[in-house]
Amino acid sequence: MIEADRLISAGTTLPEDVADRAIRPKLLEEYVGQPQVRSQMEIFIKAAKLRGDALDHLLIFGPPGLGKTTLANIVANEMGVNLRTTSGPVLEKAGDLAAMLTNLEPHDVLFIDEIHRLSPVVEEVLYPAMEDYQLDIMIGEGPAARSIKIDLPPFTLIGATTRAGSLTSPLRDRFGIVQRLEFYQVPDLQYIVSRSARFMGLEMSDDGALEVARRARGTPRIANRLLRRVRDFAEVKHDGTISADIAAQALDMLNVDAEGFDYMDRKLLLAVIDKFFGGPVGLDNLAAAIGEERETIEDVLEPYLIQQGFLQRTPRGRMATTRAWNHFGITPPEMP
C-alpha cells in the first residue's frame, strides 16, 4: 500500500480535495486554530499596510494538510493584492521564475509550494529578487554573454514546505517572517468540520462533528475528507443526518479507529507487539514482516505514530510504547 491509497494520508491531495477551496477561510478573522500564527500575522499585515509596504517574505512550514496554501491566500486577501501560485518542481529553469517575477505588480504575493525542491540554478535567481527586488539575467552565450539587471516591483514571496531542514541557509535567511503550523487541537477541528458541514448543506450534530474531529489526526485536510465519506454513509444507510453514532459507524467501516489509525498503522504496531514482543526490531526486519518498503515505513507510517507516542525509534530499533499495548487491550510485559 502506498501513501496515495490511504484515506488518512495528508501528504496526498485527492481530486475531491480541490472542492475544499470553496470552504476555506478567506480572511484572518475566519481562520481557526494556530492562535500564535494568527495573532502575529495580523500585526505584520496591519503594519505593512500602514506603511504602504509589501509584506516581508514569509516562510510557512509544517506537516502536510495543515493549511499552508490557505494561509498564503489569506495573506493576499488581507493585503488586497494578487496571488500568483507555483511550486518548486515546476520551476525547472531560471527563465521560468524570471517570467513569473516580471509579471508581478507592486506588493503582489508569489506563492511557491514545496520550495525545498527548487533547483540550485533557480534558487540563485531568487536571492537578488528577494533581497534587492532585482533580477539578474544573462543575455547571449560565450564571449558575447552579458548580464543585465531588471528592477522588480516590491513583492512578497511566500514559501511553503514540509521539510524546513532541507532549505539552504542562504534561502532560509532571506525570509523575514517564519511561521510553523502545528497539528490542530480537537475543538478547533470540530469547529472546522461543523463549518464545512454547513457549507455542504449537511445536518450534523455537534457530537457528530466531534467524532470526525477526533479521528482526523489533527489535520483539517483529513477532517474534510472523512466528513465527505461520513456524508456518503449517512445518505445511503440513513436519512442523511450525521450524529455521533452514525459518524462512528461510518469511520469504523472505513477502518479509521478512535486514534485516527488505519489498517496499515495497526498492522505495523501489531507486528512490533506480536512478532517482536514489543521490540526493539530493526527496520529491515519490520519491513519484511509487514510487506512494505523501508522508505514507506520511515516516511509515511512512522511519523504520526512517533508523534503521538505509540512508537519509539531507538538506536537498537523500533519499540512499541505502553500506549500502543494499551490501545490494543494487550498487557505490556513487565520491565526487567
From Swiss-Prot:
Activity regulation field: The ATPase activity is inhibited by the ADP product.
Residues bound to ATP: I23, R24, G65, K68, T69, T70, E131, D132, Y133, R174, Y184, R221
Region described as Small ATPAse domain (RuvB-S): 185-255
Annotated SUPFAM superfamilies: P-loop containing nucleoside triphosphate hydrolases, Winged helix' DNA-binding domain
Keyword set includes Amino-acid biosynthesis: no
Impact reported for A22V: Defective replication fork reversal (RFR), UV light resistant, resistant to mitomycin C (MMC)
Disruption phenotype: Sensitive to radiation, filamentous growth after transient inhibition of DNA synthesis, little effect on conjugal recombination in wild-type strains. Increased sensitivity to mitomycin and UV light. Suppresses lethality in recB-recC and dnaB temperature-sensitive mutants.
Cofactor(s) the protein requires to work: Mg(2+)
Inducing stimuli: Part of the ruvA-ruvB operon. Expression of the ruv region is induced by damage to DNA and is regulated by LexA as part of the SOS response. RuvA and RuvB are also involved in mutagenesis induced by UV and X irradiation and by some chemicals. Induced by hydroxyurea.
UniProt enzyme class: hydrolase
GO cellular component, one term: cytosol
CDD domains, per database record: AAA
Note on how the cofactor is bound: Branch migration by the RuvA-RuvB complex requires Mg(2+).
Positions bound to Mg(2+): T69
Catalysed reaction equations from the record: ATP + H2O = ADP + phosphate + H(+)
Summary of subunit composition and partner proteins: Monomer in solution. Homodimer in solution. Homohexamer. Forms a stable RuvA-RuvB-Holliday junction (HJ) complex in the presence of non-hydrolyzable (d)NTPs; in the presence of hydrolyzable (d)NTPs branch migration occurs. Two oppositely facing RuvB hexamers sandwich possibly 2 RuvA tetramers at cruciform DNA structures. Homododecamer composed of two hexameric rings; when bound to DNA in the presence of ATP-gamma-S and Mg(2+). Forms a complex with RuvA without DNA. Forms a complex with RuvC without DNA.
Entry-linked PANTHER family: HOLLIDAY JUNCTION BRANCH MIGRATION COMPLEX SUBUNIT RUVB (PTHR42848:SF1), PTHR42848
Family, per entry: Belongs to the RuvB family.
Role of this protein: The RuvABC complex is involved in recombinational repair of UV or chemically damaged DNA. The complex also plays an important role in the rescue of blocked DNA replication forks via replication fork reversal (RFR); RFR and homologous recombination required for UV light survival can be separated. This subunit has a weak ATPase activity that is inhibited by its ADP product; binds ADP better than ATP. Promotes Holliday junction (HJ) branch migration in conjunction with RuvA. Binds to HJ cruciform DNA; in the presence of RuvA, ATP and Mg(2+) the junction is dissociated.
The protein's name in its UniProt record: Holliday junction branch migration complex subunit RuvB
Organism field: Escherichia coli (strain K12)
